[in-house]
Amino acid sequence: MKPLGLILSLLSASFSLAIARCARHSTITRSCYEKATPQQFPELLELHKSLVEIPSVSDSEGAVGRFLQDYLAQRGYTVYAQPVEGGDGDRHNIFAYLGGSNRTQVLVTSHIDTRRGTELWGRGTVDAKGSVAAQIAAVESLRRGHGIAEEGGDVALLTAAAAWRRLTTSVSGDGRAVIFGEPTEGKLARGHKGILSVSLAAAGKAGHSGYPEPGANAIDTLVRGLASLQLAELPRSEEFGNTTLNVGVIQGGVADNVIPAQASASALVRLATDRVNDTIAIIERAVHEASPGVQTEFPYSQGPVPIDYDVEGFETVILNYGTDIPNLKGNHKRYLYGPGSIHVAHSDQEHLDVSDLEAAVQDYSTLISKVLTR
Ligand SMILES: *[C@@H]1O[C@H](CO)[C@@H](O)[C@H](O)[C@H]1NC(C)=O
Ligand SMILES: *[C@@H]1O[C@H](CO)[C@@H](O)[C@H](O)[C@H]1NC(C)=O
Ligand SMILES: *[C@@H]1O[C@H](CO)[C@@H](O)[C@H](O)[C@H]1NC(C)=O
């Protein structure tokens, strides 16, 4: 390796390390970003830092929305803040485009809320503020290189406060393509699994634990059903792999010396086939054969979602998480790409390498350009 090349690669390795290391602490310090300032996309790290520093747990995304609104308006975009119902009443989807027409060939979109788990919640470094920062930097870099028309019509940016499904009426993709940003480890998604939510409930008869005979233990009934459910063989497919099941919530009982009268659980199935009804039938059979007293309900389902990946030069991947892609209707191509890994998103280990963020800017630029020149 030539000395210059060596120095450059050492520098870039230390940039990557810097953010990853800093991000392990609960707040990213200013010096993390200073140590890691890249030359290629001047706005990238500053923007990412600003986005990550503004909290935006789902249902209260007001501040980060206003920041983006100002940021984009200052750069000459026409910005429309679409109010979103729910949450603390101060949340907006930010829709931005160049020129006077909001009808564009490409819509580039991601979400700005950071998901709240039951115990841990990520700061959104990866999911999905990495995508938002890289998408904006990509559009800005294309503008600088005259890859998109300054007078508009090519690209619109949409940052959703919570869910794209709220946008279907106002921004359905009439253009050629919508590019979605979620963590895909820098790969182009060929599709993602579907979802089936399962609610289970058992009713019993309360009583004193010392005298079990007249009572009926709802927890015992439920647990027998759950144990059988976990052994059920769910349909798989070549493209999407195994259908998997997670029992994520279990509730019931009041005290260890009282026979519980109620117990319930909920599970989420990640569907690898669109045979939703078959999967429901398998689950019902497994639960009811082992424990007839358990009631099952299936409040929500969505089959696996195939996604376009007809752009050369990308590794591709099937993702096991859901997105709102099926909710954005329209006759357009759909691409899904983003920096970072879902394995660290939503946790206090959430972090992103600067090199991945920079690669994402390049890749979003490529995707946008390829669609525009078709
Ligand atoms: C797009 O522009 C049209 C015409 O000006 C307008 O009716 C519509 O509300 C706009 N939509 C958004 C999301 O800005
Ligand atoms: C899918 O399930 C089969 C059978 O249970 C298992 O052997 C295999 O390792 C699973 N594949 C993946 C990718 O988890
Ligand atoms: C699945 O079951 C529902 C409810 O029973 C029914 O309305 C629907 O048509 C079924 N879908 C298929 C593909 O069989």
Can you annotate each of these PLM segments?
Residues 2-18:
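Cleavable N-terminal signal peptides of Sec/SRP-targeted secreted and luminal proteins
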Residues 90-94, 196-198, 263:
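Short beta-strand micro-motifs in enzyme catalytic cores
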Residues 19-32, 38-39, 183, 190, ...:
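Metal-dependent amide/peptide-bond hydrolase catalytic core
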Residues 109-111, 158-160, 179-182, 201-203, ...:
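Short beta-strand segments
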Residues 103, 113-117, 175, 190-201:
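Acidic-glycine-rich active-site phosphate/pyrophosphate-binding loop
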Residues 124, 128-197, 237-238:
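Acidic/histidine-rich catalytic neighborhood of metal-dependent amide-processing enzymes
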Residues 104-106, 156, 176-179, 244, ...:
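Structural motif
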Residues 2-3, 19-125, 143-152, 336:
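Acidic/His- and Gly-rich active-site-bordering loop/insert found
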